[in-house]
Amino acid sequence: MGDKAENAFSITVFSCRRNKKGLHCAKFFGDFHIDKRGRLCYNVGRRITLLPAARRRRREHGNMERYGISAQLQCVPELDTEFFPIGRFNRAFLETAKHPLSVAVERADGRVACVHTRIHNTPEMRTADCYYIDRLVKTLLWMKGGFRIYTDSAEMYAYLQEQYSAGGGRDFDRDFMANVYEHPFEVVLTDRVPESCDAPKAMGGHLDGCRIGFDAGGSDRKVSAVLDGKTVYSEEVVWFPKTNSDPAYHYEGIVAALRSAAAHLPRVDAVGVSSAGIYINNRTMSASLFLKVPKEQFGAQVKDIYIRAITDTFGDVPYCVINDGDVSALAGAMSLNDSSVLGIAMGTSEAAGFVDEQGRVTGWLNELAFVPVDAAAGAMQDEWSGDIGCGVKYFSQDGVIKLAPRAGIVLEESLSPAEKLKAVQELMARDDPRAAAVYRSIGVYLGHTLAYYHTLYGCRHVLLLGRVMSGRGGDLILGVCRDVLRREYPELEGRLLPALPDEKFRRVGQSMAAASLPALR
């Protein structure tokens, strides 16, 4: 530590015990000074909010509390000491909740996700009860999808009815799900909540015949021609689907890719499509690829765009269109020669897919970007949904950007989010301790959250993909994540196996996995 001016100093690791104001602060890296009001500031003039001493001690010991529900943690992110893993909140909540309650969410074709749980049902714990049910229902909606909520609790019915009304706290979720499922959103009070009903489909792993696999990304499109399990041709073409408002551009790009692959096969027996977005019965219900297409054209020209492109080009051949996250999970299952795989891609957002114990694709939404992971009152807000504490702000480039200033990394505001991520990655490549703190914090987030995802999915393997997981930062995230699982969740040892993709996974590839989706007739 060396003085630069009065009350100014430079540090590598800073951990203040107590100053004259009776305040405590966390660990940071870089140059600091104390201003006239006794506040700790970065060298660029940015303030750090100092916590009162008693409150800071509580965080150092990992005691988390909200709405009268508390939990003790061994592992706390060094750059986000308020982080309260939602799984630990739920566990502590249920330890004292005794009143039975059921909730269910219905989606397309009569499929239902039902949870039998408990609340306190006392006046003093009503806020905690409402918060728990709010987070549970939101998790069910974004994990499995739905347009109708059922509950057998009159009090929780009134709360959910208010939240999921126009202008209510969950108006975004209500409107989104109503559009995806093409059905008005409803909350129903009943004394007979429907039980869970699923219909996972055996997709993928079909390598016989002449197949085409198409992978539609936001910046490039990939296509493969596969003959009896062997890739005989593949190409990758840059395109700009997110900035084009004319759906003819998308249609022509898809058809061009299909024809390019078909030219290298004697015939076409089946076509599989992997595409970012939400797909129900092969139809596009919501996808950022068509972000600029006017709403009035979406229904007529986008919802069936893949179906039209395939049938217009090849006639009546088997086809399958699913979310790219599910295809990633399928590629992981094929490379591992195992099942029960949750794939998580940490890039622009948090994308996910799941292959169950029987190797089947579930048809769930798996939109983990909007599933709550943090119960802290001050959790970061997602600009799109307006909610706080959801996965997108922890397991995407947004998570890195959020933590960087707390580590003393100053990112130019003019940079795009992808460029800001790259800047932190470059620091990590040079062993910058500030960047390491960012990745360690994400590793702690991930360890706690994977344990929670395990309670939702029962997954055995977790495949970690995307730009955030690339390079040395990804290795550090994985190492810290495994340590958190070992220390906080020893019961999951051997039952939950997070990993980065290996060469075998890369050989399978997204487009080849997509080609394996449909069975031949």
Identify the function of each model-found stretch.
Residues 114-140, 243-256, 260-266, 402-461, ...:
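Adenine-nucleotide phosphate-binding core of ATP-dependent small-molecule kinases
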Residues 121-134, 138-144, 155, 159-191, ...:
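Glycine-rich phosphate-binding loop and adjoining helix at the ATP-binding site
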Residues 143-153, 267-276, 457-468:
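Short glycine-rich phosphate-binding loop at a beta-alpha junction
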Residues 17, 23-27, 31-35, 39-43, ...:
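Short, positively charged and aromatic/hydrophobic N-terminal segments
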Residues 62-199:
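N-terminal accessory interaction module
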Residues 148-150, 209-215, 268-272, 341-345, ...:
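Short glycine-aspartate micro-motif
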